[in-house]
């Protein structure tokens, strides 16, 4: 029994009860005049408009007291729902008398009209109308029928869209807090409610006073606007603003968007047992470890520490109860640190870095306690997180239950995320220092200390290195028999001497015993070492070296290939061991290499002046021709920019030729550790042509490089590009994130539902081309997919792949070697599984390299894989200065959005609707168009194109239905009308692939 139940405070008349009711008891405001609900009137499509069959504009005039609406025409020539102005209303009253017809304004009028709607009858009429309606009329009828049937089903009445009462949310949900200095901070809702109450009370008073109609009308309109602002401020007219001209947040804003109730508080909550800190590199960590600062660990694992302290009991330095355990922790007793070590062991934690663009943005690690306040991250997982150590922060979460810990350990450990879900290539690969270390280690040099020495074992080689008898780059011989029995050497090879370098012997020690010895950076080496590297005992090895050219060092791409090979052959555990070894070796050797950069490493090009002189002379010639009127301004511009661009390329090739292979800057860019040729080119060559803010190329190039220094004008020209770079990055991130969200939204239901859908349709795939350039080779398209039909070698007639067999690397190689150009594979496009896809149509799971499992959320993975590289795509819509391509080419992210949204692309190509012959092409200079006539078997079509369109056909050419007449992107909506769904899907697929490949991003 509650003691104070039903007692009311005698001072202020408030019921005495628990404070919880402040969150649940609602109030209401009884309105003196009905008010329409803005969601139903202003929402798109307007629900009121559809029910009443009136335009939103007419409704607005009625609701906000601009026009009268006829409710009952009586025996006058007026029509029901006709709008009349104030003046017309007076005139009709004088003409027909005041009682003959009924017209009203405001929400009352709407309410009466809605109350008269007979839903059942309405639905019948609309169904009859649908039988013979077409086009716009039909669309509108369908929409109206949807709304009417929804009303019938829900049992709501249309007139309820007009409110007589406004509910008031509980006071704790719109709090008011006292600040120091006696002022109050309050929720915006209180202001909005106050406006409604004030206007409502004023209206009541005016009605009691029998005030003139126009004043009452004005007050009713103001009440309507106040309620609108309360429900959805800013939806109609200017938003009501509070202090500092800030629009007030209405009820709708509390729910809407990223900061709204749903996304902020229901889908994303702040959780306990989490923290965030700056990250720092932890080269001492193993692949599945992270360094956790002790301070954070004590806080994160508190309940576990308390539990363990109580288990220990006081006799072992622990505690008897929670209170004393808490005291021990607060006092930082030594026993707490010992317990912490125990608790943390084998308890995985999750690390997340925002923005989480793909599933590798959250991974599990085993914590290792470290001093300091920064969390330590393994250097190899930085790629997956897109993290660097310039002040990035990361969040950490502790899985509590046994199930959560098991899930983190089995599915999320960093060591098992070696391949990227987007293309199946290793995402953890050595970078920067580690790359340059392994590059330096595997470099060969001719004629240095100890060349031609022969050793009996790898240990002997390392001993000679320590004694400075040989160097890392020295070419030596080693007895092949000294290697492990498992090494795939033939008996003939084992009896001979293998030639290699000291560094490569050390590098090969980190590879598995039965993995081929890697001696040159070629993929053939993975199937066994080339026989030419084995010499008979007694051969003049020094003489052999003199005639043999040097093998290249292992660059970052090749290191990735090694990792992929190890993963394919030995699975996760061995790969993560290799990665750690590669990391340690890389750091060690790059430290020992003493690689530095100095000013004189930026080589100067003596020939540069000549090239620039030639270019200047050529530009002067072009300008002269323009002055004489031999060239148009556009032609002059194109030729000038082309001249400079050619000069740039010439200097670039000279620069590449002049680089010494020992030059540290060259080594950095060549190994793939940092920088690329265009960075070096700006340092030592010339900066080249720059773009103006409007995207047009400035025809005056920056001829200086950074080593010489830029003059003021050149520096100024360069700033455009820098500014564009910054703004682009900011815009790109937002756009790319939004694209990912929309993609996930549509694709999240696509799940692998069954083993085999039994479809009999496949997809013919061949290499995707763009002109003569291969965008994606056939190998990449068939790898990991199932064959729909048997693949037969055209030369021998043997079956390479049976029907429904998965095409793995070995089979794919055979198909390519047989010279086959097109393969029919099973594809998601032709899968017949309902609400998802089947295993056979999907194929291999990129992230594991195994066949996909039933239940895998492949839709979400695909959406993330497209969205994640989105930030690397450019935002550019190219503006070509001249008329050469007068349409702007949309590229990068905007192009991807254009394809997915199936919008009308910019500068689109016309598609032929008939198969036939091009009979004539006529230019009409007057209206700047050209007309292409195509004569089909049954009818002739004419296509009018802009005069600048570049045609794909000439007179007399044959053209097929659904082929493009001119250059440019196709409109998917047009394409699907004249061809099949499959062809359209294929076109969109190839186009998206093209955009990503042009930016050097692979998605499979």
Swiss-Prot record:
<dbReference type="InterPro" id="IPR007066">
    <property type="entry name" value="RNA_pol_Rpb1_3"/>
</dbReference>
<feature type="binding site">
    <location>
        <position position="757"/>
    </location>
    <ligand>
        <name>Zn(2+)</name>
    </ligand>
</feature>
<dbReference type="InterPro" id="IPR007083">
    <property type="entry name" value="RNA_pol_Rpb1_4"/>
</dbReference>
<comment type="similarity">
    <text>Belongs to the RNA polymerase beta' chain family.</text>
</comment>
<keyword id="KW-0479">Metal-binding</keyword>
<keyword id="KW-0804">Transcription</keyword>
<dbReference type="GO" id="GO:0046872">
    <property type="term" value="F:metal ion binding"/>
</dbReference>
<dbReference type="InterPro" id="IPR007081">
    <property type="entry name" value="RNA_pol_Rpb1_5"/>
</dbReference>
<keyword id="KW-0460">Magnesium</keyword>
<dbReference type="InterPro" id="IPR012754">
    <property type="entry name" value="DNA-dir_RpoC_beta_prime_bact"/>
</dbReference>
<dbReference type="InterPro" id="IPR042102">
    <property type="entry name" value="RNA_pol_Rpb1_3_sf"/>
</dbReference>
<dbReference type="InterPro" id="IPR045867">
    <property type="entry name" value="DNA-dir_RpoC_beta_prime"/>
</dbReference>
<dbReference type="GO" id="GO:0003677">
    <property type="term" value="F:DNA binding"/>
</dbReference>
<feature type="binding site">
    <location>
        <position position="838"/>
    </location>
    <ligand>
        <name>Zn(2+)</name>
    </ligand>
</feature>
<feature type="binding site">
    <location>
        <position position="831"/>
    </location>
    <ligand>
        <name>Zn(2+)</name>
    </ligand>
</feature>
<feature type="binding site">
    <location>
        <position position="841"/>
    </location>
    <ligand>
        <name>Zn(2+)</name>
    </ligand>
</feature>
<dbReference type="InterPro" id="IPR007080">
    <property type="entry name" value="RNA_pol_Rpb1_1"/>
</dbReference>
<feature type="binding site">
    <location>
        <position position="392"/>
    </location>
    <ligand>
        <name>Mg(2+)</name>
    </ligand>
</feature>
<keyword id="KW-0808">Transferase</keyword>
<dbReference type="GO" id="GO:0003899">
    <property type="term" value="F:DNA-directed RNA polymerase activity"/>
</dbReference>
<dbReference type="InterPro" id="IPR044893">
    <property type="entry name" value="RNA_pol_Rpb1_clamp_domain"/>
</dbReference>
<comment type="subunit">
    <text>The RNAP catalytic core consists of 2 alpha, 1 beta, 1 beta' and 1 omega subunit. When a sigma factor is associated with the core the holoenzyme is formed, which can initiate transcription.</text>
</comment>
<dbReference type="InterPro" id="IPR000722">
    <property type="entry name" value="RNA_pol_asu"/>
</dbReference>
<keyword id="KW-0548">Nucleotidyltransferase</keyword>
<dbReference type="Pfam" id="PF00623">
    <property type="entry name" value="RNA_pol_Rpb1_2"/>
</dbReference>
<dbReference type="InterPro" id="IPR006592">
    <property type="entry name" value="RNA_pol_N"/>
</dbReference>
<protein>
    <recommendedName>
        <fullName>DNA-directed RNA polymerase subunit beta'</fullName>
        <ecNumber>2.7.7.6</ecNumber>
    </recommendedName>
</protein>
<dbReference type="Pfam" id="PF04997">
    <property type="entry name" value="RNA_pol_Rpb1_1"/>
</dbReference>
<dbReference type="Pfam" id="PF05000">
    <property type="entry name" value="RNA_pol_Rpb1_4"/>
</dbReference>
<feature type="binding site">
    <location>
        <position position="388"/>
    </location>
    <ligand>
        <name>Mg(2+)</name>
    </ligand>
</feature>
<keyword id="KW-0240">DNA-directed RNA polymerase</keyword>
<keyword id="KW-0862">Zinc</keyword>
<dbReference type="GO" id="GO:0000428">
    <property type="term" value="C:DNA-directed RNA polymerase complex"/>
</dbReference>
<dbReference type="Pfam" id="PF04983">
    <property type="entry name" value="RNA_pol_Rpb1_3"/>
</dbReference>
<dbReference type="InterPro" id="IPR038120">
    <property type="entry name" value="Rpb1_funnel_sf"/>
</dbReference>
<dbReference type="GO" id="GO:0006351">
    <property type="term" value="P:DNA-templated transcription"/>
</dbReference>
<comment type="function">
    <text>DNA-dependent RNA polymerase catalyzes the transcription of DNA into RNA using the four ribonucleoside triphosphates as substrates.</text>
</comment>
<dbReference type="Pfam" id="PF04998">
    <property type="entry name" value="RNA_pol_Rpb1_5"/>
</dbReference>
<feature type="binding site">
    <location>
        <position position="390"/>
    </location>
    <ligand>
        <name>Mg(2+)</name>
    </ligand>
</feature>
């Amino acid at each position: 029994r509650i003691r104070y139940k039903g007692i009311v405070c005698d001072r202020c008349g408030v019921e005495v009860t628990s404070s919880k009711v402040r969150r649940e008891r609602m109030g209401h405001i009884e309105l003196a005049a009905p008010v329409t609900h803005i969601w139903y009137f202003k929402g798109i499509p307007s629900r009121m408009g559809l029910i009443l069959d009136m335009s939103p504009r007419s409704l607005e005039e009625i609701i906000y007291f601009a026009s009268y609406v006829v409710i009952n025409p009586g025996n006058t020539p007026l029509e029901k729902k006709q709008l009349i102005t104030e003046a017309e209303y007076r005139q009709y009253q004088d003409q027909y008398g005041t009682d003959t017809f009924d017209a009203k304004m405001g929400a009352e009028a709407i309410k009466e009209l809605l109350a008269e709607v007979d839903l059942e009858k309405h639905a019948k009429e609309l169904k009859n109308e649908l039988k013979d309606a077409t086009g716009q009329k039909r669309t509108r009828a369908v929409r109206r029928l949807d709304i009417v049937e929804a009303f019938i089903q829900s049992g709501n009445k249309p007139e309820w869209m007009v409110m007589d009462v406004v509910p008031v949310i509980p006071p704790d949900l719109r709090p008011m807090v006292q600040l120091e200095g006696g002022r109050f901070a309050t929720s915006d809702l209180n202001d909005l409610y106050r406006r409604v109450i004030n206007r409502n009370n004023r209206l009541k008073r005016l009605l009691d006073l029998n005030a003139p109609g126009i004043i009452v009308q004005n007050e009713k309109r103001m009440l309507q606007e106040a309620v609108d602002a309360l429900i959805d401020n800013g939806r109609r007219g200017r938003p009501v603003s509070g202090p500092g001209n800030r629009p007030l947040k209405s009820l709708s804003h509390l729910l809407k968007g990223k900061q709204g109730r749903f996304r902020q508080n229901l889908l994303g909550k702040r959780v306990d047992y989490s923290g965030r800190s700056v990250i720092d590199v932890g080269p001492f960590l193993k692949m599945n470890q992270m360094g956790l600062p002790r301070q954070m660990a004590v806080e994160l694992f508190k309940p576990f520490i308390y539990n363990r302290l109580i288990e220990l009991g006081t006799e072992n330095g622990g505690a008897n109860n929670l209170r004393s355990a808490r005291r021990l922790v607060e006092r930082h007793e030594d026993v707490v640190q010992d317990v912490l070590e125990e608790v943390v062991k084998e308890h995985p934690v999750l690390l997340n870095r925002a923005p989480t663009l793909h599933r590798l943005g959250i991974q599990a690690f085993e914590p290792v306690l470290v001093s300091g306040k920064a969390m330590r991250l393994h250097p190899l997982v930085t790629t997956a997180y897109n993290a660097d150590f310039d002040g990035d922060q990361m969040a950490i979460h502790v899985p509590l239950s046994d199930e959560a810990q098991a899930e983190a350990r089995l599915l999320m450990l960093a060591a098992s995320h070696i391949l990227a879900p987007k293309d199946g290539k290793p995402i953890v690969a050595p970078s920067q220092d580690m790359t340059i270390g392994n590059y330096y280690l595997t470099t060969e040099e001719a004629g240095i200390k100890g060349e031609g020495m022969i050793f009996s074992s790898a240990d002997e080689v390392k001993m000679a290195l320590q004694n400075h008898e040989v160097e890392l780059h020295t070419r030596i011989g080693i007895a092949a028999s000294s290697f492990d029995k498992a090494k795939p050497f033939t008996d003939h090879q084992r009896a001979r001497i293998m030639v290699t370098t000291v560094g490569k012997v050390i590098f090969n020690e980190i590879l598995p015993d039965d993995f081929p010895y890697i001696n040159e950076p070629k993929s053939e080496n993975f199937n066994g070492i080339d026989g030419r590297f084995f010499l008979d005992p007694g051969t003049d090895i020094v003489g052999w070296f003199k005639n043999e050219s040097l093998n290249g060092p292992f660059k970052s791409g090749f290191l990735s290939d090694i990792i992929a090979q190890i993963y394919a052959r030995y699975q996760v555990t061995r790969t993560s061991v290799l990665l750690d070894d590669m990391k340690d070796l890389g750091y060690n050797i790059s430290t020992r290499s003493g690689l530095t950069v100095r000013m004189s490493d930026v080589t100067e090009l003596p020939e540069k002046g000549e090239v620039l002189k030639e270019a200047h002379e050529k530009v002067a010639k072009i300008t002269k021709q323009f002055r004489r009127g031999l060239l148009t301004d556009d032609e002059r511009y194109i030729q000038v920019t082309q001249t400079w661009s050619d000069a740039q390329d010439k200097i670039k090739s000279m620069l590449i030729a002049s680089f010494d292979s020992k030059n540290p800057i060259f080594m950095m860019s060549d190994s793939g550790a940092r920088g690329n040729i265009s960075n070096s080119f700006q340092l030592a060559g010339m900066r080249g042509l720059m773009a103006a803010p409007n995207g047009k190329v400035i025809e005056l190039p920056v001829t200086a490089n950074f080593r010489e220094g830029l003059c003021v004008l050149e520096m100024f020209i360069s700033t455009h590009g820098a500014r564009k770079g910054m703004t682009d990055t900011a815009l790109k991130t937002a756009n790319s994130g939004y694209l990912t969200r929309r993609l996930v939204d549509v694709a999240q239901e696509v799940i692998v539902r069954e083993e085999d859908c039994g479809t009999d349709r496949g997809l013919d795939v061949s290499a995707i081309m763009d002109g003569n350039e291969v965008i994606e080779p056939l190998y990449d398209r068939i790898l990991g997919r199932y064959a729909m039909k048997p693949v037969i070698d055209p030369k021998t007639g043997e079956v390479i792949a049976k029907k429904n067999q998965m095409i793995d690397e070995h089979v794919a190689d055979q198909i390519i070697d047989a010279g086959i150009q097109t393969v029919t594979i099973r594809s998601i496009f032709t899968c017949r599984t309902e609400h998802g896809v089947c295993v056979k149509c999907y194929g291999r799971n990129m992230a594991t390299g195994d066949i996909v499992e039933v239940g895998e959320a492949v839709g979400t993975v695909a959406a993330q894989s497209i969205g994640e590289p989105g930030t690397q795509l450019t935002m550019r819509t190219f503006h070509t200065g001249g008329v050469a391509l007068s349409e702007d080419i949309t590229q990068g992210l905007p192009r991807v959005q254009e394809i997915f949204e199936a919008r009308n692309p910019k500068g689109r190509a016309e598609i032929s609707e008939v198969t036939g012959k091009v009979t004539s092409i006529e230019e009409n200079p007057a209206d700047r168009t050209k007309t292409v006539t195509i004569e089909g078997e049954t009818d002739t079509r004419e296509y009018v194109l802009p005069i600048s369109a570049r045609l794909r056909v000439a007179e007399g050419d044959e053209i097929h239905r659904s082929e493009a007449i001119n250059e440019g992107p196709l409109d998917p909506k047009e394409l699907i009308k004249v061809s099949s769904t499959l062809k359209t899907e294929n076109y969109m697929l190839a186009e998206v692939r093209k955009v990503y490949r042009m930016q050097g991003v692979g998605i499979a």
